[in-house]
C-alpha cells in the first residue's frame, strides 16, 4: 500500500495480518532533495517486524560523511535489508544499476526477478568503470568534499541573489518559481546559456510548486558554480 509522510505506522498496523511486510522508500526524494527519515523508518520496521528497502539512486555517493549513502548519514549500515542504486548518477553517468542485500534475498532475486531475468548484462566497459569509481570514492574523500562545498556555494549564491531555494541534504537543489510557465521559460533560457536544468510543474509536483531542479556536480570548478 502507498503511504504519505507520517502515515507509515498506521499502514504497518493494518498489514500485521500479512505474512511479510516490507517498507520501500527513496533515500533522497528527487523533487526536493531531502533525505528520508531512515532512522524512524528502521525503528518502525523493527517494531512491526518489516523489511526495509531503500532506493539509493540519489543518495549513494552523496550522503554521509564519506558519501556512502543514507545508511552512513544515519549510522544505520547493516540495518537495511535491500539497497538499490544506479551507475547513472553519482557514479559516473553510465547505464545500469545494482541491488545489494543478504545472500538469500539476492539469490531469490536472481531466480525470481523478471526485470533481472529478461535484461541483458551490462557491457564489460561499464562494469569496469563502475568498479573503478567505487574504488576512487573508497580511497579518497576529495570528490565528495568538493561536492558538498559546491552545493553550499551554489545555495548561498542563489539565496543571496534573492531566489527561494528549498533546504537540501543532497546534490539536488530545487529553485522555487511557483509558476509552471515561468519554470519552463527559465529552464529554456538557461539551456540557451549552456546550463542544463529541468523545469518541473504539476502533476510532477503539487500545484503552485513549480521549480527548476539543479543537480550540482563535484566536476564543476567553484568559479563555474
Give the residues covered by each predicted segment.
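Short, small-residue-biased leader/transition segments that mark boundaries at the very start
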Residues: 1-2
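Short, small-residue-enriched loops and turns at beta-alpha junctions
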Residues: 5-7, 27-32, 59-63, 116-117, ...
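Catalytic PLP-binding core of fold-type I/II PLP enzymes
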Residues: 18, 22-23, 33-66
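Active-site C-terminal subdomain of aminotransferase-like
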Residues: 48-51, 58, 63-169, 182
Amino acid at each position: 500500500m502507498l503511504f504519505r509522510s507520517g502515515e507509515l505506522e498506521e499502514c504497518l498496523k493494518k498489514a500485521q495480518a500479512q505474512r511479510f511486510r516490507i517498507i520501500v522508500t527513496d533515500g533522497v526524494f528527487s523533487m526536493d532533495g531531502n533525505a528520508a527519515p531512515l532512522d524512524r523508518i528502521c525503528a518502525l520496521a523493527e517494531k512491526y517486524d518489516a523489511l526495509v528497502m531503500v532506493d539509493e539512486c540519489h543518495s549513494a555517493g552523496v550522503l554521509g560523511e564519506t558519501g556512502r549513502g543514507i545508511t552512513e548519514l544515519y549510522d544505520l549500515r547493516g540495518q537495511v535489508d535491500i539497497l538499490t542504486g544506479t551507475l547513472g548518477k553519482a557514479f559516473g553517468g553510465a547505464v545500469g544499476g545494482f541491488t545489494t542485500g543478504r545472500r538469500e534475498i539476492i539469490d531469490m532475486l536472481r531466480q525470481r526477478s523478471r526485470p533481472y531475468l529478461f535484461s541483458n548484462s551490462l557491457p564489460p566497459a561499464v562494469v569496469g568503470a563502475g568498479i573503478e569509481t567505487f574504488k576512487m570514492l573508497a580511497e579518497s574523500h576529495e570528490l565528495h568534499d568538493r561536492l558538498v562545498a559546491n552545493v553550499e556555494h551554489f545555495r548561498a549564491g542563489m539565496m543571496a541573489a534573492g531566489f527561494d531555494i528549498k533546504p537540501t541534504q543532497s546534490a539536488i537543489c530545487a529553485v522555487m518559481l511557483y509558476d509552471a510557465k515561468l519554470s519552463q521559460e527559465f529552464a529554456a533560457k538557461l539551456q540557451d546559456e549552456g546550463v542544463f536544468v529541468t523545469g518541473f510543474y504539476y502533476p510532477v509536483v503539487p500545484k503552485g510548486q513549480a521549480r527548476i531542479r539543479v543537480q550540482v556536480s563535484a566536476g564543476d570548478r567553484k568559479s563555474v558554480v
